[in-house]
């Protein structure tokens, strides 16, 4: 083998890649420089290709595409407005912008690794950058402003299309073959293509009968084939009425076969419909079980029930006036009408009124003929409790408490266990005299006794009032505890 030009020991691998084509302002420069850098040291020569193989794999179209991209990128103009956020539409946005000055320009960072290499982060970039010049940004905007009238003019064709006249004659009616006219073709030139599409469509229908799109089966001859007329080409673009007339004339006797087929379909549908109706007429619905008869019953056993129902029905269906009269007899609070008042005033009250008495009432009166002794003998000792007859005492209420006197025993402090009767206390209250008022011809000793007695009475009242408060508090605590117990017992559920 010949000795290689470069030995493996001394060779150095280089890799080429495209550098970033954005400047420090983030604008596209349109220039892509090839940068050469050192490759990896551990690179092995297994993937080396000869020059002929590379040339075979590289297509000429790729080279042309690369050249086209380079040319287009060179033609691109630098759009300063896009970097600021405005459209390049010919409008002078600098009129409405405030000039910038005295600030610090922070450059756009396109590579994050570049920011990581900085120790102080973005602060270091701001220090190294230049301050923003006065009127920065406005010059770039005003530079792209189109001041020439020629550049802003609209084409005459667009103006004519936008102009709309009020006259109806100005609107042109489109022909049926306006698509062909727009493409610059004629019917004669496209007739072959139309025939091919028709034949393809007919073949598709023959293979797939389920996708037959023609109404009423006008082209079907009954033998599984579709016929094509002789003059289909001439009549294809004529009016619809003439087209359908020709098809009906060409069908001929094939309509009989179609009628027979339709009759068979109608009979099948009717049979299916009758079967569905029979299913709905069945009384067995779902999974319900049929009713079972438990046996026969005599109607005479229910005569009392029927009679009661008839009586209630007659009572509830009486005339309205009769119902009102019965209500007024039973209820004295219902007001009378003026007519009823006039009838009552005109009535002769001295006249005797005969009242008919039914046999049923006489039967009830016979039961009342029993003596008191015989009736008392019918009662047992459980119901009959003999005792002395006494006059019932009237219940007297206390003025202080409002409770009945003699029902609740009360004890007073200072007594030796012998409580006075409530009636005596009430009598003493009635006999009590106002001790706070001085009397005529009162001596000093009597006055002193009166004041001492008044003090004792007030002291006793204060003690009673205090005892009453304590009793109420105890009862309140007791009732609250009872209510809590009831709530807890009601909320607890026990399962066995």
UniProtKB/Swiss-Prot annotation:
Basic and acidic residues composition-biased segments: 28-37, 453-462
Keywords for this protein: Coiled coil
Record flagged with keyword Coiled coil: yes
InterPro entries: Ltv1
Coiled-coil segments on the chain, per record: 439-474
Gene Ontology CC: cytosol; nucleus; preribosome, small subunit precursor
Annotated family: Belongs to the LTV1 family.
Protein name listed in UniProt: Protein LTV1 homolog
Biological source species: Dictyostelium discoideum
């Amino acid at each position: 083998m010949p000795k290689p030009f470069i030995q493996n020991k001394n060779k150095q691998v280089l890799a080429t890649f495209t550098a970033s084509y954005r400047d420090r302002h983030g604008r596209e420069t349109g220039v892509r420089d090839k940068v050469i850098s050192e490759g990896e040291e551990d690179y092995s020569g297994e993937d080396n290709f000869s020059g002929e193989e590379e040339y075979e794999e590289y297509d000429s179209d790729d080279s042309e595409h690369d050249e086209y991209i380079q040319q287009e990128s060179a033609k691109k103009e630098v759009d300063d407005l896009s970097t600021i956020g405005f459209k390049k539409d010919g409008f002078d946005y600098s009129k409405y912008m405030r000039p910038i000055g005295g600030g610090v320009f922070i450059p756009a960072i396109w590579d994050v690794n570049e920011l990581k290499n900085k120790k102080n982060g973005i602060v270091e970039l701001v220090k190294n950058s230049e301050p923003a010049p006065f009127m920065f940004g406005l010059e770039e905007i005003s530079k792209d402003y189109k001041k020439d009238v020629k550049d802003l003019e609209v084409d005459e064709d667009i103006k004519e299309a936008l102009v709309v006249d009020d006259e109806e004659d100005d609107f042109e009616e489109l022909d049926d073959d306006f698509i062909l006219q727009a493409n610059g073709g004629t019917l004669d030139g496209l007739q072959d293509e139309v025939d091919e599409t028709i034949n393809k469509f007919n073949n598709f229908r023959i293979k797939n009968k389920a996708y037959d799109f023609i109404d009423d089966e006008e082209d079907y001859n009954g033998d599984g084939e579709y016929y094509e007329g002789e003059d289909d080409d001439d009549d294809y673009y004529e009016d619809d009425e003439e087209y359908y007339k020709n098809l009906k004339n060409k069908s001929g006797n094939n309509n009989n076969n179609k009628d027979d087929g339709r009759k068979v379909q109608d009979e099948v549908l009717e049979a299916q419909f009758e079967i569905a109706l029979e299913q709905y007429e069945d009384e067995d619905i779902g999974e319900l079980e049929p009713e079972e008869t438990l046996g026969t019953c005599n109607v005479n056993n229910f005569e009392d029930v029927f009679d009661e129902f008839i009586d209630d029905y007659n009572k509830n269906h009486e005339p309205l006036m009769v119902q009102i009269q019965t209500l007024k007899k039973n209820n004295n609070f219902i007001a009378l009408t003026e007519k009823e008042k006039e009838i009552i005033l005109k009535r002769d009250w001295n006249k005797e009124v005969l009242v008919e008495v039914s046999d049923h009432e006489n039967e009830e009166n016979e039961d009342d003929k029993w003596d008191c002794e015989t009736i008392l003998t019918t009662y047992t000792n459980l119901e009959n409790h003999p005792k002395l007859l006494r006059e019932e005492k009237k219940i007297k209420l206390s003025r202080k408490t409002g409770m009945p006197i003699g029902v609740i025993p009360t004890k007073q402090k200072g007594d030796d266990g012998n409580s006075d009767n409530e009636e005596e206390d009430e009598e003493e209250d009635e006999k009590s005299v106002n001790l706070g008022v001085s009397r005529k011809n009162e001596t000093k000793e009597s006055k002193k006794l009166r004041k001492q007695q008044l003090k004792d009475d007030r002291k006793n009242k204060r003690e009673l009032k205090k005892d009453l408060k304590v009793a109420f508090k105890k009862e309140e605590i007791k009732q609250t505890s009872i209510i809590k117990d009831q709530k807890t017992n009601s909320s607890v559920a026990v399962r066995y």
